[in-house]
Structures are given as structure tokens and as C-alpha cells.
Amino acid sequence: MQRLCVYVLIFALALAAFSEASWKPRSQQPDAPLGTGANRDLELPWLEQQGPASHHRRQLGPQGPPHLVADPSKKQGPWLEEEEEAYGWMDFGRRSAEDEN
């Protein structure tokens, strides 16, 4: 019996944690500032497509359209070379092959 109660409690907590339901209708929610100037015009249509956001998502703020989010795998610039130099000492296999040639 105790095991069943623990499972039900864990299920209820998980459901509450992952729930995206909004407790208030959209008309009663306070309007959060979205930004200023041109950024606000860009964010509004994308945010309206997403529907009502959860409490936690509203606390984080607008994320913006996916095409405006930076992709860390496409790094360019001088910092890439600095990172390669900083982590070069870990590349034992390549260094061994270069030393033998």
C-alpha cells in the first residue's frame, strides 16, 4: 500500500512539473513587456503562434523565433583557434601521429 502511495505521489509531482497548462485564461494574464522598438515587432507574431505559455516559460521571457537563435556548432572567428589551442594538449593521438612523421 505504501508503495502505491509513493508511486501516485511521484506521478502527481511529475505531472505538475511537466504540465504546460495555464491556470488563468489568456485575457486575465498580465501583459509582460516584450521588448522595445523593432524587436517587439519581430517577436509578437511568433509569440502569438505559440499559444498560451506556462508560468515557468513566462518567467524566462520570450525566446524569439528559432531562426534568430545562435547555433553554437557554427562558431567562427578568432576564439575558435584559441579554443583549439587550449584543448590541443588533450589530442594525444593526433600529436603522436604528427611526431612520428
Curated annotation (Swiss-Prot):
Superkingdom field = Eukaryota
Q: Name one Pfam family in it.
A: Gastrin
A cellular component term, taken from the record's GO annotations: extracellular space
UniProt-recorded Gene Ontology molecular function terms:
hormone activity
Q: Briefly state the protein's biological role.
A: Gastrin stimulates the stomach mucosa to produce and secrete hydrochloric acid and the pancreas to secrete its digestive enzymes. It also stimulates smooth muscle contraction and increases blood circulation and water secretion in the stomach and intestine.
Tell me which family the UniProt entry assigns to this protein: Belongs to the gastrin/cholecystokinin family.
Q: What is this protein's name?
A: Gastrin
